[in-house]
Amino acid sequence: DLKKFPGKRGLKKEAKVNLEFALMADGVAAGDVYKVLATKEGVDRAFKKLETIKSSVVWWEAGAQPPQLLASGEVTMTTAYNGRLFTPAVTENKPFVIIWDGQQQVFDNWAIVKGTKNKDLALDFVAFSTSTKPLADQATYIPYGPARKSSAPFVGKFEDGKTDMAPHMPTNPDNMKNAIVQDVKFWADKYDELNERFVAWIGK
């Protein structure tokens, strides 16, 4: 809404995430986004919505760029990795506020190479790194995850010893009311096709 909230918008230079945001901005419920995006009409609808702000978009490619764009005043709002905004807001008192409504959650994964000589050691590491306490401890440094529900009660304070991390977690129930989890299967099947169209659209 450029009229209600004037100013430039920062968006990642990629189809993934932006098409989902566009459909939600156009009134599609979070739970229906991928069902709609799986149709030609849905894709067209997403691009049509993006077109309404295209002239006001500043495209970013690296995760470090959104906080820089905000701090410099080049954009009024931007999509971003939440951890990239949290740290400068807390440690440098930057006036950044995260809008959780419509957030998209993306998961990272561990993989073990088939045939590795260290299979047992690798399995031990994956088991440890995805267990309850280590995932909660990770949140001491950056507010990502934890992906395991059992970790939530153990999330403590930021490394400054003062800032409670729980309210800053994407997985905090208060932050998940209108969230969607990125559909990795959808993007595995459609990424090349949709991103090619996206790149061509940017260049028009």
Predicted regions and their residues:
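Short, hydrophobic alpha-helical packing/hinge segments within bilobed ligand-binding/sensory domains
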Residues: 66-69, 85, 122, 135
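Mature extracytoplasmic/periplasmic domains
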Residues: 113-178
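Solvent-exposed loop/turn segments at secondary-structure junctions
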Residues: 15-19, 83-87, 103-105, 117, ...
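Periplasmic-binding protein-like
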Residues: 43-44, 48-52, 91-116, 158-161
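Conserved C-terminal helix/tail region of periplasmic/extracytoplasmic solute-binding proteins
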Residues: 68, 174-204
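Sec-exported extracytoplasmic/periplasmic mature domains
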Residues: 2-5, 23-28, 51-55, 71, ...
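A ligand-binding cleft/hinge motif common to bilobed small-molecule-binding domains
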Residues: 77-94
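Extracytoplasmic ligand-binding site segments that recognize negatively charged/polar headgroups
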Residues: 1-65, 71
